[in-house]
């Protein structure tokens, strides 16, 4: 990660800078931002405009993307966050459940992350194009017009390709402050 030169002044409280990112490990970044507990391979590149004001960090249309032609693998352990708070009778629940299951072990051709701050919340959009490594416990049912989760007696479905769009809202500054408090306690 690099940036252009910047001058810090004791009289100034607001700073704007652009972070230029080269080959950041995607899974490590997701962990550090408090999004997911992920493992895997693959790197991201891009630029992230940052505004630092009164101890808070804001992102302004930052983006990171995988190197064209070089994919990776992502295995998310705490994928239950995707369906947390969504009632099972919600029409979108099955789509989110399918995405959650796919992200447990997903091979992607390309990935993109977009960062924006809305008030005190980090709005992160993650786009992945690829396919699940394993057969998923879902089958297409014509009467429902979509996929439904099935039990172990069904063969499930082998997906040839899926584009996943995941929207996350994270209390980023709170996570940073909490991490700093723990660090100061441990030291």
What are these regions (language model features)?
Residues 1-185:
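Small-residue helix/turn framework positions
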